């Protein structure tokens, strides 16, 4: 959530920046609401002052044994008006809060302005995409897996429905090996603390990281006595660890990682990526989360992104880094780098990780702060998150980039030990 005071002091700037994100901020309406709120608060203070004065007068009369019935009525009238104002003020404040909750984060100054992914800016490339023989074009990962009888979409459709998968045998083992490889790298090489977190969260957590109220349709919600939702990403439970906390500044930065399934309805993506593992209702990620101080926020984004890159480099998967434009960034993000891995069958790069610096946007929603003895009052932390990596998309990238003409799949050297010495799937 944006700082209400900053908005009031910088209305035109905020409106311009929000417009680059496709959000139309009605300045006149906001000013009118703020003016009305101020008037109501001033009237409340005025009435409370009158009530206090009258109450003192009643006390004086009673102490002297005098009748005070003539001014009791005034107190009752004031109390009645205060109740009306309280209701109006609450409704108005709820309206203002809903407006604030609907606003996306303001982009950092170096974020390119653009309407969608076509205007993202490529930062760099790593690795060289493999060239396939003209007579042996790259096969799609879904076809390779089905021929090997190790990826089964039909079984998943029978069990559940579309956009689910059953992995079998050595490909299921490869999926598990990837997860362990990523966790080991981040905990042993990059200094992350590994967490095991709930896969269901309450609404407060979803408001804290920005999934609610805007993205309610993309969530799978439980029915019955529990108002919980399945997590769309481990970012939600991990980041909410610091909700309503005042952290010791000396304990920052904090680096957290967790492997979880993620559940998304994929509302709005009908007809897109209907084949294969690219877009599933249930998929797994190894998530990276940083909690740091404001001065280190942008620097931490570079570090987090490099940690996700290391996974791709160790697996020798060609990729590129793109800086997202204003129109393509996530709701809570201030600045985002996407890592896109090369997919031979599509002859293009596809997103495998999104690394975002959220500034104090989530922290303000969560009331997540830090303090040290030299500070007059607690300050909001900065939060960052990214995939390190999406396991299913890494799996499909390996299947396609390491496919052989005979239909087998070579195992990247970094994973052979995790595969129990298996070097090829056939």
Swiss-Prot record:
Record's GO cellular component terms: cytoplasm
Keywords: Aminoacyl-tRNA synthetase, ATP-binding, Cytoplasm, Ligase, Nucleotide-binding, Protein biosynthesis
CDD domains: SerRS_core
Signal sequence extent: none
Keyword flag ATP-binding: yes
GO molecular function, one term: serine-tRNA ligase activity
Keyword Isomerase belongs to the record: no
InterPro entries membership: aa-tRNA-synt_IIb, aa-tRNA-synth_II, aa-tRNA-synth_II/BPL/LPL, Ser-tRNA-ligase_type_1, Ser-tRNA-synth_1_N, SerRS_1_N_sf, SerRS_core, tRNA-bd_arm
Pathway linked to the protein: Aminoacyl-tRNA biosynthesis; selenocysteinyl-tRNA(Sec) biosynthesis; L-seryl-tRNA(Sec) from L-serine and tRNA(Sec): step 1/1
Chemical reaction(s) catalysed: tRNA(Ser) + L-serine + ATP = L-seryl-tRNA(Ser) + AMP + diphosphate + H(+); tRNA(Sec) + L-serine + ATP = L-seryl-tRNA(Sec) + AMP + diphosphate + H(+)
Subcellular location: Cytoplasm
Binding site for ATP: 264-266, 351-354
Pfam families per record: Seryl_tRNA_N (PF02403), tRNA-synt_2b (PF00587)
Gene Ontology biological process terms, A to Z: selenocysteine biosynthetic process; seryl-tRNA aminoacylation
Sequence positions that bind L-serine: 233-235, 287, 387
EC number in record: 6.1.1.11
PANTHER family to which the protein is assigned, alphabetical: SERINE--TRNA LIGASE (PTHR43697:SF1), SERYL-TRNA SYNTHETASE (PTHR43697)
Protein task: Catalyzes the attachment of serine to tRNA(Ser). Is also able to aminoacylate tRNA(Sec) with serine, to form the misacylated tRNA L-seryl-tRNA(Sec), which will be further converted into selenocysteinyl-tRNA(Sec).
Domain-level remarks: Consists of two distinct domains, a catalytic core and a N-terminal extension that is involved in tRNA binding.
Known partners and oligomeric status: Homodimer. The tRNA molecule binds across the dimer.
Family assignment from sequence similarity: Belongs to the class-II aminoacyl-tRNA synthetase family. Type-1 seryl-tRNA synthetase subfamily.
Protein name according to UniProt: Serine--tRNA ligase
Species assigned in the record: Francisella philomiragia subsp. philomiragia (strain ATCC 25017 / CCUG 19701 / FSC 153 / O#319-036)
Gene name, Swiss-Prot/TrEMBL: serS
């Amino acid at each position: 959530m944006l700082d209400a005071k900053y908005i009031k002091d910088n209305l035109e700037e905020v409106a311009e920046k929000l417009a680059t994100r496709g959000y139309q901020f009605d300045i006149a309406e906001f000013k009118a609401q703020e003016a009305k709120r101020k008037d109501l608060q001033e009237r409340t203070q005025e009435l409370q002052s009158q009530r206090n004065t009258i109450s003192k007068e009643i006390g004086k009369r009673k102490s002297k044994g005098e009748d005070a019935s003539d001014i009791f009525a005034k107190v009752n009238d004031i109390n009645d008006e205060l109740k009306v104002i309280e209701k109006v003020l609450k409704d108005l404040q709820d309206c203002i809060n809903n407006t604030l909750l609907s606003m996306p984060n303001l982009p950092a100054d170096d974020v390119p302005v653009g309407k969608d992914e076509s205007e993202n800016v490529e930062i760099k490339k790593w690795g060289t995409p493999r060239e396939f023989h003209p007579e042996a074009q790259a096969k799609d990962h879904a076809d390779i897996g089905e021929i090997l009888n190790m990826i089964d979409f039909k079984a998943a459709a029978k069990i559940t429905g579309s956009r689910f998968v059953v992995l079998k045998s050595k490909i299921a083992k490869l999926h598990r090996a990837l997860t362990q490889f990523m966790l080991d790298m981040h905990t042993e090489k990059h200094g992350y603390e590994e967490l095991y977190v709930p896969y269901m969260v309450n609404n407060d957590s979803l408001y804290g990281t920005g999934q609610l109220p805007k993205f309610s349709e993309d969530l799978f919600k439980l029915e019955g006595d529990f108002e919980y939702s399945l997590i769309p990403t481990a970012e939600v439970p991990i980041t909410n660890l610091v909700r309503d906390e005042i952290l010791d500044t000396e304990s920052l930065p904090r680096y957290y990682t967790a492997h979880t399934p993620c559940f998304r309805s994929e509302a709005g993506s009908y007809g897109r990526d209907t084949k294969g593992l690219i877009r599933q209702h249930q998929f797994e990620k190894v998530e990276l989360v940083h909690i740091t101080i404001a001065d280190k926020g942008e620097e931490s984004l570079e570090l987090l992104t490099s940690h996700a890159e290391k996974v791709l480099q160790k697996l020798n998967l060609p990729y590129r880094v793109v800086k997202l434009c204003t129109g393509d960034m996530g709701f809570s993000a201030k600045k985002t780098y996407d890592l896109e891995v090369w997919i031979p069958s599509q002859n293009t790069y596809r997103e495998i990780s999104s690394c975002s610096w959220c500034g104090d946007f989530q922290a303000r929603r969560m009331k997540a702060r830090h303090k040290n003895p030299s500070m007059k009052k607690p300050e909001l932390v900065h939060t960052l998150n990214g995939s390190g990596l999406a396991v299913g998309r890494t799996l499909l990238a390996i299947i396609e980039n390491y496919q052989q003409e005979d239909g087998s799949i070579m195992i990247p050297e970094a994973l052979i030990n995790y595969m129990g010495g298996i070097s090829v799937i056939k």
